[in-house]
């Protein structure tokens, strides 16, 4: 909730963890149980280098930025990529709904998540309107850098772990 200056900002910050807690978390916990794993098992694993670099980039953007514009630019690529990727998957292969991962796909391709993405994008537009040219450029750079890390995150998911 770093650098939040208004209640509106706090509400927007809380909306993403709210989705995770209410929807994605339930689905993820179901998968863990199904595969005989626990949340503690996952938490004990070291972050992969791609994840560590991404997390560090996001934290640095929030810590070193002037306020909410930098924070949201660091978070938005993650949120938008999930919605876009899972919606494309569903559009191309509707039968994915009937697979093991159908519930996960539906979490991110559903109307509730699409609404949340639109709300976050609108909020980003609002907090980035009127920024100085220098700060706007920094925000674009943060969005770009985090988008590149998001791409590496998705690429990483196709590579088996070699560090365990």
Give names to the regions the model predicted.
Residues 11-115, 148:
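Active-site-proximal alpha-helical scaffolds that flank and shape metal-associated catalytic sites
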Residues 110-144:
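Long amphipathic all-alpha helical oligomerization modules
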Residues 6-10:
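Transmembrane-helix boundary and interhelical linker motifs in polytopic inner-membrane proteins
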Residues 1-5:
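N-terminal domain-start signal
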Residues 138-164:
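Acidic, carboxylate-rich catalytic segments that either coordinate divalent cations
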Residues 31-32, 83, 124, 128, ...:
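Hydrophobic residues within well-ordered, non-membrane alpha-helices that form the packing/core
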